[in-house]
Amino acid sequence: MMFYVKNNGLCFLFQKSFGTSGVNAIGSFQLSQLNSSSVQSKLKAAGINTNSKQYKAAVKQMMSAGNGAMYGNIQGIKNLMSHYDKDGDYINPVNGLAGLLVTDENESSRKRIISIPDSSKEEMYELTKKEFLRENGVHNGDTTKRTDVYNNLYRKMSKKDRLAAGYTLEKYERIYRQAFYDAAKKADPNWEIGKPIKDGALDSVTRETAESGKSPAQATLDTKI
């Protein structure tokens, strides 16, 4: 499944403090001075809403990556704010979507099966079949286009359901791979992953037959590959 873990290395200006002043030579300020009236006035004059969730998320990130004795500046804060949406949720830089950040708080809740569009299941089925045949059953992370399928799904889902949708699609992907594996073995009992698959071995496997009687919630337990 494709999801994104928070990167504490987001870029914004930090400089070590070598003096006692709260503002350095290039107009930056110590993070400990963020809530001072002078810095708040500068932020508001620059068009930054210091009451917004977007701003608060950016400041939280800055504080977690540095400390009060380090420096930041207005442009750095603006740049960091662009990584968050109006709700203060991290925006993935690859697909421009929020709601895909795995945190300690949502690690458990994201692992649930929800309803996802048939079009996404069909897209995953077709890609899994194509790659299974091309790679002779090998799960090749270097050549797969799975990320595209997951990103297409995420765009169809509401922000709050994106992680769970990805988790659900991963289960269907496992079901499809297992169905193709079983069909290849049925066509040639001596077949092994990495060896050429017998022509037509997967022709009888449709998405409907692959899913028949299978529960996505049990996919991890039932699948062998």
Regions found by a protein language model. Give the residues of each.
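Type III/flagellar secretion export determinants
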Residues: 1-225
